[in-house]
């Protein structure tokens, strides 16, 4: 569908590798062997100038599940420490990040590359669009079961909505997560390139 939605003006002499089978997944994700724990992985990315991390954790303060949240901002890290059941990953190394993601039972993430990595790990994910370019892709993430649900921070009740969706997804017995992201995206790209130069 990417061809219809985003690449309407393709040039005939170009080859576009579109679709989930071309999503490259970092080798650290493919090699990870983490044990699942009852925890929520939260990654909003960037500098979080809107303090969304704090609002999000506050909205989940009554959800008795450990929360692992990634933050690069020292001030936000100090504010997050006052909440119980919260572990802050401050500027984590890649391997720490991957292990935290892989060991979680549910995730909250921006609509970004991290969502594809979470889908590869089969982690049900609630996505939040924090930028205009992310809003465009939200419908596709949901339609193709890359993410389990979506929260719009433009909705005045988004915090209650988030709490409700986290509880529903956490206690849901099974999740329909797209199987097309299989870690072979890089191989598929290389194969297509080799076919073109034959």
Feature-to-residue mapping (PLM):
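Catalytic binding pocket for nucleotide-activated donors in carbohydrate/polymer assembly enzymes
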Residues: 116-160
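A short, well-ordered alpha-helix in the C-terminal region of glycosyltransferases
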Residues: 171-183
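Nucleotide-activated donor-binding/catalytic signature segment of Leloir-type glycosyltransferases, i.e.
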Residues: 77-93
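Acidic donor-binding loop of glycosyltransferase active sites
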Residues: 102-113
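Conserved catalytic-core segment of nucleotide-activated headgroup transferases in glycan assembly
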Residues: 30, 36-75
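C-terminal alpha-helical cap of glycosyltransferases
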Residues: 167, 182-198
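Short acidic alpha-helix that forms the nucleotide-activated donor recognition element
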Residues: 93-104, 119-120
